[in-house]
A protein has these predicted regions:
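FIC/Doc superfamily catalytic core
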Residues: 1-127
Length: 127
C-alpha cells in the first residue's frame, strides 16, 4: 500500500479491480481521458515511477484518440502537483491546466523528450 503525504492510493488488495475499472473507462473526449488519467493515478500500481509512467500513458491515449500530446515543458510544477492532489475531488483544475498545453506535434522528438525531462522534474529531480 502506497501513500504520499496524507493521500493513500488504492489498496493493493483491490488493485486488480481498480485497474479493471480504469481499463473500462471511456476515452473518447478530452474530459473522459483526464478522468481516466486521474483514476489511474489513484490506482498507483508501482512502488516508483507512477507519475512518470502515467504521464507517458496519458500522452499515448491523447495521441491515439485526439491526435495531440501534452507539452509538459509549459506546465508549471507547483500548479500541476496541486491540480493532481485536488483532481480526485474535481479534475476541472487539471483539465484547465493541461488543455491549453496540448499540441499536435505528436511526432516531435523534442516535445516528447522535453516532456520526459519535465516529468522527472515534477518528481523532485533537478533539471
Amino acid at each position: 500500500n502506497i501513500a504520499k503525504g496524507n493521500f493513500r492510493f488504492a489498496n493493493s488488495l483491490y488493485l486488480d479491480a481498480v485497474l479493471s475499472a480504469v481499463e473500462k473507462m471511456h476515452e473518447n473526449t478530452f474530459e473522459e481521458i483526464i478522468a481516466k488519467y486521474v483514476e489511474m493515478n489513484v490506482a498507483h500500481p508501482f512502488m516508483e515511477g507512477n507519475g512518470r509512467s502515467t504521464r507517458i500513458w496519458l500522452d499515448m491515449i491523447l495521441k491515439k484518440r485526439l491526435g495531440k500530446v501534452t507539452d509538459w515543458a509549459k506546465i508549471d510544477k507547483v500548479q500541476y502537483l496541486q491540480a493532481m492532489e485536488r483532481s480526485t475531488v474535481n479534475d476541472l483544475e487539471l483539465r484547465f491546466l493541461i488543455q491549453p498545453n496540448l499540441t499536435d506535434k505528436v511526432n516531435d522528438r523534442e516535445v516528447i523528450f522535453k516532456g520526459i525531462e519535465q516529468s522527472y522534474y515534477y518528481e523532485g529531480y533537478e533539471k
